[in-house]
Amino acid sequence: MKLIVSVMPRSLEEAQALDATRYLDADIIEWRADYLPKEAILQVAPAIFEKFAGRELVFTLRTRSEGGEIDLSPEEYIHLIKEVAQFYQPDYIDFEYYSYKDVFEEMLDFPNLVLSYHNFQETPENMMEILSELTILNPKLVKVAVMAHTEQDVLDLMNYTRGFKTLNPEQEYVTISMGKVGKVSRITADVTGSSWSFASLDEVSAPGQISLASMKKIREILDEA
């Protein structure tokens, strides 16, 4: 289980002020570029990639329809992703498949896609269909984050993940039950078959995130013989 921490600067000045040494315990950095005005993203990109040079990095534009901070037309979304990919080669690129399915074909040349689905309202009844459709597309990683309201919501997602991982051992998954009741899904990633778990440093990027320090301790305990 790799631990991912998001950076969410809201300006070039905030990006330049980031102290990369505070993120050394994170295995992967996620740049949530949606916290910036869309016209500032490409201006801030050099500072982010210089700051975290040599680190694994996920480039993410989380749109409002999936719980993020930005609204982008399909053309704007694809343009920003392609520009960042061309000039900075992030290790992973998050792609909101269900929000931008109509332009997905333009991303087929990218081998490092994280195909993602986010639902901040509920754990939908068609989770099996969602996981199945994303798996068939054979991305680098399938990411599903849904809101849990009951313990059964959490158990359902964990069981679906374990089942899909068993049937597709070469496919990497990240599944998250958001919210307080879903915290257990964040610490049992290795059991359910998730490759990553998201943690927070100063600011959470999703409900129910656990601090990086706590997640590191939990991982150490779980890794003990």
Curated annotation (Swiss-Prot):
Encoding gene (name): aroD
Keyword Amino-acid biosynthesis (UniProt): yes
GO molecular function, one term: 3-dehydroquinate dehydratase activity
Binding site for 3-dehydroquinate: S6, E30, W31, R32, R62, R186, S205, Q209
Keywords: Amino-acid biosynthesis, Aromatic amino acid biosynthesis, Lyase, Schiff base
Function: Involved in the third step of the chorismate pathway, which leads to the biosynthesis of aromatic amino acids. Catalyzes the cis-dehydration of 3-dehydroquinate (DHQ) and introduces the first double bond of the aromatic ring to yield 3-dehydroshikimate.
Designated name of the protein: 3-dehydroquinate dehydratase
The family this protein is said to belong to: Belongs to the type-I 3-dehydroquinase family.
Pathway(s) served: Metabolic intermediate biosynthesis; chorismate biosynthesis; chorismate from D-erythrose 4-phosphate and phosphoenolpyruvate: step 3/7
